[in-house]
Amino acid sequence: MAVGTASLQDRLETWAQRLKNLTVSPLTRDYPDTQKTDSKRVIEAFESLQLPKAKLTGSSSSFIAFLTAFIILVARLTGDEDIAVGTNSNEDGRAFVIRVPIDTSESFAQLYAKVDKAYKEGSSQIVPLGSLRSYIQEKSKSERTPVLFRFAAYDAPASSQDYPANTFDTTDLVVNVAPGSAEVELGAYYNQRLFSSARIAFILKQLASIASNAAANPDEAIGRIDLMTEDQRALLPDPTCNLNWSNFRGAIHDIFTANAERHPEKLCVVETQSSSSPHREFTYRQINEASNILGHHLVRSGIQRGEVVMVYAYRGVDLVVAVMGILKAGATFSVIDPAYPPERQNIYLDVARPRALVNIAKATKDAGELSDIVRTFIDENLELRTEIPALALLDDGTLAGGSINGQDVFANDVALKSKPTGVVVGPDSIPTLSFTSGSEGRPKGVRGRHFSLAYYFPWMSETFKLTPDEKFTMLSGIAHDPIQRDIFTPLFLGAQLLVPAREDIQNEKLAEWIEKYGATITHLTPAMGQILVGGASAQFPALHHAFFVGDILIKRDCRSLQGLAPNVSIVNMYGTTETQRAVSYYEIPSYASNEGYLNNMKDVIMAGRGMLDVQMLVVNRYDPTRLCAIGEVGEIYVRAGGLAEGYLGSPELSAKKFLNNWFVNPEIWAEKDQAESRNEPWRQFYVGPRDRLYRSGDLGRYTPSGDVECSGRADDQVKIRGFRIELGEIDTHLSQHPLVRENVTLVRRDKDEEPTLVSYFVPDMNKWASWLESKGLKDDDSDSEGMVGLLRRFRPLRDDAREHLRTKLPTYAVPTVIIPLKRMPLNPNGKIDKPALPFPDTAELSAAAPRRASSALQALSETEQTLAQVWAKLIPNVTSRMIGPDDSFFDLGGHSILAQQMFFELRRKWRVIDISMNAIFRSPTLKGFASEIDRLLAMESFATSDDKTLAVQAANEPDDEYSKDAVQLVNELPKTFPQRTEAMLTSEPTVFLTGATGFLGAHILRDLLTRKSPSTKVVALVRAKTEELALERLRSTCRAYGFWDEAWTAKLQAVCGDLGKPQFGLSQSVWDDLTNRVDAVIHNGALVHWVYPYATLRPANVMGTIDALKLCASGKAKQFAFVSSTSALDKDRYVQESERIIAAGGNGISEDDDMEGSRVGLGTGYGQSKWAGEYLVKEAGRRGLRGTIVRSGYVLGDSVTGTTNTDDFLIRMLKGCIQIGLRPNIFNTVNMVPVDHVARIVIATAFHPPATGVNVAHVTGHPRLRFNQFLGALELYGYNVPQVDYVPWSTSLEQYVNDGEHNDKESQHALMPLYHFVTSDLPSNTKAPELDDVNAATALRADATWSGVDASAGAGVTEELVGLYASYLVQTGFLPAPTVAGARPLPAAQISEEQKKTLLSVGGRGGTS
């Protein structure tokens, strides 16, 4: 379609209006985004699917139909109703945005018409997307580049594997639609550092499912179109299966009684010492007898089954006695927390309508008697059968109830202490009444059932290895239903319950308490977990399981807990008061067993999957008869036999929330139950099997593993100024700020009654001082008690948090007010008490206005001390006391290998710290390097997310030192270079060669000396003490690589020198001789090191290049070949430019590129040194030099013999994959070329340079394998290395390194020297541009008349060559032999014993000789 005639400015304005207030939600991730910011994605992995056209009819096979299906899929996966995706013109392939509002009730055909119209309008007004972004950004005066779309679907008529030209940085997923004659191929490009291949494969199948289902029924509502496929269904719960509704395990109090009879003198409850009470211990017999007494009293008082008994409670053994006694009477226990205001206590009493009241003596002593308001309510509104005035279990185990009329209320019941009450209950009897929030502030009373209290404990015991020897904690809020877990779990197991004093439940002390008493199991809310770890330093290694319930659990808190309890496995349990014990679970293994597990988890821990006979059903919101497909947003329903009965006194609400299962006919369960009945006594209190679902109101998704992750509340979305805002999303991002320990966001009304976003946070004071120091600020703690003082003191942190949120959220979602608190107010249930959160008035905000900041305190940091300990551990003969702030890592004895090990240790110390290897060379002193770490810790200590990327970027500002240096070094070059018009090379040219003892250099030497026409003499620069030793080094190197002919010595001269010294360290006489004798210079030598900084490599790689050029400028005219590297182009800009060129039909980055794209910000010192070298050589070309710069990629083994350099990264990758038994899924192409072909190119360009000046010759592989193909060749030849996603592969590598069994030289992982590189983000790190190689081909064609071989078609590493290399490496002992018979046998590679011996003294890609 032709672009309209409107001006570009008019079209930009049209598009800006069209895309106003755009909703652009990302695809939910499988892994944390540790490397890229939210505004940047790298597309580097590929999946494909073929859909037979037979499943499509008519227009349903058109691109517009697939685009419509794609938009439906995006809507279903994100939950959005305003969809913007990228697409392209079917005429010229140019990209544009299509925006379509959707209604889930409209049909596919209706949406198709809307999409078709929007497509035609958009394709007729195309503007460059870069220009559109800039226009919108400038118009909105925003600091952030706008994101126009996260998803794109492109018309790719040639092939779905055509790399999409429009894979912009902000794209999560690109789908290419390539129609064929018999099938439509769908190809997906994605970033596997964020998304698993399993998720993408499911997405393609879902897209195909939408397309085929819509073809069959185009009038079906788009919200009802089925995304499910059989392979998804196999992973998800079956809502029609039997969940064993009738498998009642017995009443929890009867199980407790049986345990008491089996081991009566075993410790049951321990009340630990406090400042006001002694340490007290009670046995199972004492608790059993005491609860029997209470039970008999209640029965004698007329309490009937299911009647409520309210407990005015206190945390302690008395509460355990009260609960068990009430249950033994067949009654329902409920709890009032004395901390509640009297008015709220009355609400609970009004809802519960109890028939008995148990006052725990310690509660009345601590909080006072029931208030007059409560007492009046009881007298006027309740009909109590009995009241226990002061229940107390005395130190000797005697139970007291308090005196009435001069006699203890239990006086007539004590004689029955050894006898059970005999009250029978069943699975549908009501043992508990718990409260949860309700509308208009009135709580709902949830009636729990006996079925749930004991049903899941055997499964938990087996799954989590819980034994009778455990020590449980009693930390939950006493009126919060998780207290039931605290009490019932140990009593079921016959274990011990530890009760802390109130003073122990606070920061620092709680950790000390757990350590002191050796707790092994704890149940926590996330808020209580934050109290446990906040400010704590005590380690508690005995704790092996922590079960979290009640709120969202985030990775930061898990990491903090495992930092104190390395043996604790953390179990996140999703459930509600209404589901009772029927919950889902997701287990995080202990740090001791799997150090890196949390690294690859997202910030919010998923809900997981249902425990025994519990199902998490994510139901389609538009068609409840269907489960959601993987990744689709739906509402979470819990299906289980252990659900609560319902809400007390609210049958209508119960009917809305507790629903009969519509997926199955319930009659089948009744028939099964009747067949299994044995007329057990409890069946009289069982209404029969009820297949019910609890509607949670939470939104969620299935993950590719079949687990469930929560994605917010169906009702937790607020609108402010017309924008939809998810409060949970704000909280998630704010929690990732390193100094935020706790946080919560609310909507409050300001003075004008306008809704205002307010975030509250508790600063992490352990990091406050170092953070201020890193900012150059001083702590203003002169008045930090009141609101004004807190606002003023933490203003820098508030501002920083706001800036942090601006990088994560749209502007409208950034809270207007951010308030620091010393601690979060908690309600008695251990949750944040939101109504108690303060809101500052205008005067307070004004008084807290900023004051002048002062300089930061100068003090030795904790980071420096820790770092010194790490250095002392690694560097021989050094102790931490010997290391001062100005001591250098290298001066102390450190080197690059120890630096790699240091980074490994740092990751263990600080979990996932990710700092560039360059940092240690840039800042080698203790103080300097600690500062580098602090920059990252300021963004990393709680999260491995986008925040860390910002810190990495701040610590590694774009570096242009190398390019500025190159510009200055131009002054060192000769002004002119000699020229002549006759043939430059005679019949017997002399070539000066550097780097001849390296892998490539030796092969260049072989090629030169074996040429017949012309016969060539070689002068090789070798680092040695004498020319005899220099020649011997050349001889040994060649023998090691399988070639040497003693006859070569007649044409070979070795001269002693050093690249890093002026004039290569040659004497003036030798230098003068060379200037007059040499016809061509091949400058191949360099110091190759991937972590050394530019300054270290400069003498050999840059100044050495200047000396090579000076050699060319003196004496007779010479031709020049400079061996460079594609690392000089290692910038994202070149990858993007390459994609554009390929899409336009080109071959890749031109050899004529001016390198301006990498003038700033090259990441390695080696690449920087090669950039500077190239800059100087090109300038020499402008001054008269004739020559070529040869840019090579990976130089692999000889294509004939298989001789291979074992120090090469790719060869190390082969061995590393074999060592861990896995290979990563990396779709990038790899520019690999056999060494003999690279050598031929170098010589061809040296002998056949351009007529004038200097050009570039790219060394490009033909064919160019992908990483998957290269590593997959191992399986072809019998190595058992299945392919997995990169993140699991990286985790396996970390585990291999961490397990401590591979520290010796033989078993140390092959990738250890490159550990940081391969575990940071290998898919992105290995993404490289495609390269045009016209000049290389031209030189090879010209050389054919000399060499007799036309190699201009190029060469590359094939799967067959990988087999040859593997055979060679097996012969040398570098690789083990294949373990099974592969599809192909290893080719034969012959290697002599002499070669094996000489190989021990040779290595490296290129020497410094």
Swiss-Prot record:
Q: Which reaction does it catalyse?
A: (S)-2-amino-6-oxohexanoate + NADP(+) + H2O = L-2-aminoadipate + NADPH + 2 H(+); (S)-2-amino-6-oxohexanoate + NAD(+) + H2O = L-2-aminoadipate + NADH + 2 H(+); (S)-2-amino-6-oxohexanoate + AMP + diphosphate + NADP(+) = L-2-aminoadipate + ATP + NADPH + H(+)
For the Carrier domain, which residue ranges apply? 858-937
EC number(s) reported in the record: 1.2.1.31, 1.2.1.95
Residues with the O-(pantetheine 4'-phosphoryl)serine modification: 896
Fetch the CDD domains from UniProt.
A_NRPS_alphaAR, SDR_e1
Q: Name one Pfam family in it.
A: PP-binding
Co-factor remark = Binds 1 phosphopantetheine covalently.
Q: Which UniProt keywords apply?
A: Amino-acid biosynthesis, Lysine biosynthesis, NADP, Oxidoreductase, Phosphopantetheine, Phosphoprotein
As for family, the record states: Belongs to the ATP-dependent AMP-binding enzyme family.
Which PANTHER family does the entry link to? CARRIER DOMAIN-CONTAINING PROTEIN, L-2-AMINOADIPATE REDUCTASE
Q: How does it assemble?
A: Heterodimer of an alpha and a beta subunit.
What job does this protein perform? Answer: Catalyzes the activation of alpha-aminoadipate by ATP-dependent adenylation and the reduction of activated alpha-aminoadipate by NADPH. The activated alpha-aminoadipate is bound to the phosphopantheinyl group of the enzyme itself before it is reduced to (S)-2-amino-6-oxohexanoate.
UniProt-recorded name of the protein: L-2-aminoadipate reductase large subunit
What is the scientific name of the source organism? Penicillium chrysogenum
The record's gene field reads: lys2
